[in-house]
Amino acid sequence: FYADVIDIGATTVVILAGTNDIAGNTGPMSIDMILNNLKSMTGIALANNVKVILCSVLPAYDYPWSPNKNPNIKIPKLNSKIKKYAKKSGVHYLDYFKALDNGNNGIDKEFSYDGVHLTLEGYKVLEPLLENALKKVTK
C-alpha cells in the first residue's frame, strides 16, 4: 500500500478489495480479518492526507475456481461492515454491489464472463459511479 499509494504522492485512493480474500485465494480469512485490512489501508491513507473512496465488494454468487465459499452470503455481510466503517471514518462509500447485483447476490453474464470478473459492459456500469465519486471527493 505504501509503494502503490503513499510513496507516489497520491492525493486520492480507490480501495476495492475483499473478493479474493473471501475466495480464500491466499488462505482462509474471516470477514473481520478482511475488514481490518481495509481499515488499515484507510487509516494509512488518512494519516497521509490521502482522500479515500472505499468500495463495496462486487457481487458473486459463487467462485468457479473455489466452490462452496458462500460469497453470496459473505459479501453482503462484509459490505454492510464496510459501509458502516466508511460512515464512521468519514470516507466516501461507493456501492458497486447494488449496481451489479442480479437480485441473487450475483452478476449476470452480460456483466461478468465467469460470475466474478467483469466484462467491458460490467466496467461501463461502474465507470460513471466512480467518476461521480471522484468528483465528490476531490472537489
List each language-model region with its residue ranges.
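Alpha-helical cap/lid subdomain in secreted, periplasmic
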Residues: 1-139
